[in-house]
Amino acid sequence: MQHVYDVTIIGGGPAGLYSAFYSGLRGLKTKLIESQSQLGGKVLLYPEKLIWDIGGQPPILGEKFVKQLIQQAKTFDPTILTNTKVDFIERQEHLFIVHTATGERHYSKTVLLAVGGGIINPQKLTLEGAEKYEMSNLHYTVQSYKRFVNRDILISGGGNAAIDWAVELSPLAKSVTVVYRKDTLSAHEATVKEAIDAGVLIECNTTITKLLANDDKTAIQLVRCENSKTKESYTRQIDEVIISHGYNCEASLTFDEAISIPKKDDYYFEGKATGETAQPGIFAAGDILSFEGKINLLLGTFQDAANAVNSIKTYLEPTAYRHGMVSSHNELFKEKNRSIIEKELVPSH
């Protein structure tokens, strides 16, 4: 039996998650499909970073922000699929069929593309056996600062992320060393100066050539590095290794011949501020959508999502209101409001 949804959202980052919430608010039967095992998009790459620029929201850690987004997205019980990679979308009469890499088919009246910059995966360290240390002390992101307290840390990379981590970890760590394969760091000059002033040791023209394990072979104990100019090598004892070599962005989504959407820079979908694209029934929100006057920040993402969902609502129901009702007067929240107020009034023990 085919389950047909009003809207299928592709992408579980901030744009997709808020679209799921707003679709429920507009009374749409909603499905969200995310290729990764976790929802949250690229914010997951920086769980310890503070986000400052969301209206009415005090500075919030990326990890907490994602948890709140997910909780909000589930308000109206959408169907959510993770570990599900969409690779092809076709148009069939009045429906869209969303095909996944495993051969599944999902049927929908509309599609909302919220895939951001694509499927993002860190560039791995290309040394034999490196993968076995990913469960111990080889890291591709900083999930928790607590992990690095009083530790000797080696960071490989010279971009903004690498030097930001060096600056942020230096007050906590026993020592921080940055190695970079080129002769000049690509991070912002001011951040590099901040790292140097904080006591971070920076070694350019240097790469990791070998990882040496501890006695029980469960973690990295020594790292061998080589200077590409002098050809000198040395071995350093470390507690934690962070690899910051950038990210691979996979953009494998394709369409059948009946679907044509112009792209900018051969990736971003050109559309309108309303979330509409050149293909009726396909909408977009967030980083993947390009239009004049777009705000490429999180706060703009939420407006993109609301506009796209409102466009979907009127596409499916031309007589529907163009915008959703404000939450303070929306009957959908009546019971939820009562429950929250009652909890606020009950004294804590």
UniProtKB/Swiss-Prot annotation:
The keyword Aminoacyl-tRNA synthetase does not apply. It catalyses: 2 reduced [2Fe-2S]-[ferredoxin] + NADP(+) + H(+) = 2 oxidized [2Fe-2S]-[ferredoxin] + NADPH. It holds the Pfam family Pyr_redox_2. Its cofactor is FAD. SUPFAM superfamilies: FAD/NAD(P)-binding domain. HAMAP family: FENR2. Belongs to the ferredoxin--NADP reductase type 2 family. It comes from the Bacteria. Its EC number is 1.18.1.2. PANTHER family: THIOREDOXIN REDUCTASE 1-RELATED-RELATED. One of its GO terms (molecular function) is ferredoxin-NADP+ reductase activity. Homodimer. Gene3D superfamilies: FAD/NAD(P)-binding domain (3.50.50.60). This is Ferredoxin--NADP reductase 3.
